[in-house]
Amino acid sequence: MTSNLYYVLISPYSLAYMVQYRSVTTAAGECRGDMWAVCARISSDVTCARHANLQRSIRRCFYIRSTMCEIMLLRDHGDYPVASRMKVIVWDEELAALAKRHTQGCVPEAYKCRHTLRFWTPGQLNFEFYADKMPFTMSLISTAIKRGHMQKHNITRDIVEKYQPVGPKGNVKELALAIFDRVTAVGCGLTTWKLGGKARAFFTCNFFSENDYNRPVYKTGNSPGEKCIKKDETFKNLCFAQEPINPNEHNL
């Protein structure tokens, strides 16, 4: 019998662009968490059966997909203004640790608890999966990436210049966060478990910053990357990873 797959984006601050995550937690039995999972004690029902380090493969998946999206939007697509200072996204251990702990609580509502001294207003993706059988991890992540990428049809020039979460044709939150030029780092975590005979997964990614309402998604210019101190060697229209961008400042 063919399994029924349900992919549900469940956070108003979400982004369906998956990056590498530090480890996978496989939970035995029912997974129950607290309302603020990051701040509170992790549910005693969560027992870690194994950990798998998937950094390299997931990082590559996100790096290629997101950067291709950035290049498409900011260089090759005539409907959008070019970005003058957008850098490649790097992995952050603190964001990953917060995301991993959040998924172990199995509760998506944790906006308040992801604020830290380094990250004043971090963005977040929450992605929930349930089906008869658990797919391969990369298949699950790839599906979420594609869902977010398809929002390119909903983003307009007006939204780039003055961010709103919904455009004339639908939601833009996920993709808008992917191309937000204050997002310079990300960290993710994934927990999987069984519930009522069904396979469940909860995936969270935390980002350096989130979009500000009515402010630009990114700073524009006459040519891509014209305000970069140095360009990335592979993706010529993006700034290199050490570009000094403060995620806690606002675009004007």
Curated annotation (Swiss-Prot):
Tissue specificity comment: Expressed in salivary glands.
SUPFAM superfamilies for the chain: PR-1-like
InterPro entries the record matches: CAP_dom, CAP_sf
Motif (Cell attachment site): 32-34
Top-level division of the source organism's lineage: Eukaryota
Gene Ontology terms: cellular component: extracellular region
Keywords: Cell adhesion impairing toxin, Hemostasis impairing toxin, Platelet aggregation inhibiting toxin, Secreted, Signal, Toxin
Domain SCP: 63-207
Subcellular location as annotated: Secreted
GO molecular function terms listed in the Swiss-Prot or TrEMBL record: toxin activity
Signal peptide as annotated in the record: 1-23
Function: Inhibits platelet aggregation induced by all agonists tested (ADP, arachidonic acid, the thromboxane A2 analog U46619, thrombin, and snake venom snaclecs (TMVA that activates platelet through GPIB, and stejnulxin that specifically acts through GPVI (GP6))). May act by competing with fibrinogen for binding to glycoprotein IIb/IIIa (ITGA2B/ITGB3).
Similarity comment text for this entry: Belongs to the CRISP family.
Protein name stated in the entry: Tabinhibitin 9
Organism field: Tabanus yao (Horsefly)
